Amino acid sequence: MLDINLFQVEKGGNPEIIRESQRKRGADVGVVDKVIEMYKEWVSLRFELDNTNKSINRVQKEIGLKMKAKEDASELLEEKNSLTERKKNLIEQETAKNKEMLNVVSSIGNIVHDSVPVSMDEDNNEIIRKWAPEGVTVEKKNCLSHHEVLTRLDGYDPERGVKVSGHRGYFLRQYGVFFNLALIQYGLDFLEKRGYIALQAPTMLNKDVMAKTAQLEQFDEELYKVIDGDEERYLIATSEQPISAYHSGEWFEKPSEQLPLKYAGYSTCYRREAGSHGRDAWGIFRVHAFEKIEQFVLTDPEKSWEAFTEMINHAEDFYKSLELPYRIVAIVSGALNNAAAKKYDLEAWFPFQGEYKELVSCSNCTDYQSRNLEIRCGVKKMGDREKKYVHCLNSTLCATERALCCILENYQTPDGVNVPKVLQPYMGGKTFLPFTKELPKNSTSKKGKN
């Protein structure tokens, strides 16, 4: 969440910066003034509580003097009891007001970076650059959709998957399994060579931890809840969630020596993905459970934009190594999630659909997450009014099922699928996977793309 001091002019803040950021997001601007008013009410309660504590101390001293002089202190004792009761009520009010205020602050998005294109329409996402392998024709005629290629490889079984697991359930089979595992292992090796620490994350988080790292609407729209007696846990939607909390409550006193910390997170991810998504619902492109390799970096605040560039470059190098055509797009302000100050997506080319689809999201969340999780940096100084928090950044490297879909469409031949060169060592040296099944009569490509 944002720094509460940013709302207070008298503390060096500038609430107009927050208002302008809210306008860019298409979000409520009036909430800024609501926080300012709530802060004043909270300060008033704190002031009253401090005065009550002073009164209690004064009365306590007077009682001591009366007792020492063996005089009647009954009236003072009654006053003390009354003040103590008042203190209790004020503490309850102050705690409730602070919680209410922080809940409102938490609903306000991060400050949108100046370089983000301002729009409420994702059609206005800005194309930063494109890349395609030299000598490769991006357009393919008479090709199959990724789910048809996987069917012909006998690489997955959606019918039995739905039978045992429900909507969008699937079994990966044979080369589907080996392709997926190859992407996982290659992704981890790729990041390990670039200084990342591999981290296999837990797939369930306690409710209080998830509340610090996920947006409120994610609880309703995206996350699966697991209830065990009185305990509530949530299945993770991305390893970013547990890894962001990995260093919660920690303080890096020597950031120049201790930061950055770079993690290659690996986990199965779970998303409810409510509703239909048209072509995205084909095959294993958009499913409820999938594997993902995630980049997560904690850095000194002054170096986070340098890290942002490095992370999107890593993602580009990964897909260049797979020789998949892609483009980088800057996401418009109105489509940013609350934590992100700026986001780039890498969209790869799917020839059957004839369009680019998102494979990577790379975000700089600045100190929005670390403030919630109390991950600080810098030398500890007595009386510091301004806390310094690390900056947190996240980027997909490879959501393996989705990346596999892209590989299948781009590497298909009339007789099977070529294996990308960088994956061949992870596929037992195989360079080509032959088709072993025919398509059903009502398959997608036989119906036409519409």
Curated annotation (Swiss-Prot):
Could you give a single Gene Ontology term from the biological process aspect?
cytoplasmic translation
**Main site of residence?**
cytoplasm
User: What class does this enzyme belong to in the EC scheme?
Assistant: ligase
- Keywords from the named record: Aminoacyl-tRNA synthetase, ATP-binding, Cytoplasm, Ligase, Nucleotide-binding, Protein biosynthesis
Q: What's its catalytic activity?
A: tRNA(Ser) + L-serine + ATP = L-seryl-tRNA(Ser) + AMP + diphosphate + H(+)
User: Which cell locations does it reside in?
Assistant: Cytoplasm, Cytosol
In this chain, ATP is annotated as bound at: 271-273, 287, 358-361
What InterPro entries is this protein classified in?
A: aa-tRNA-synt_IIb, aa-tRNA-synth_II, aa-tRNA-synth_II/BPL/LPL, Ser-tRNA-ligase_type_1, Ser-tRNA-synth_1_N, SerRS_1_N_sf, SerRS_core, tRNA-bd_arm
Q: How does it assemble?
A: Homodimer. The tRNA molecule binds across the dimer.
Give the family, as the similarity comment puts it. Answer: Belongs to the class-II aminoacyl-tRNA synthetase family. Type-1 seryl-tRNA synthetase subfamily.
Describe the function of this protein.
Answer: Catalyzes the attachment of serine to tRNA(Ser) in a two-step reaction: serine is first activated by ATP to form Ser-AMP and then transferred to the acceptor end of tRNA(Ser).
Q: What is this protein called?
A: Serine--tRNA ligase, cytoplasmic
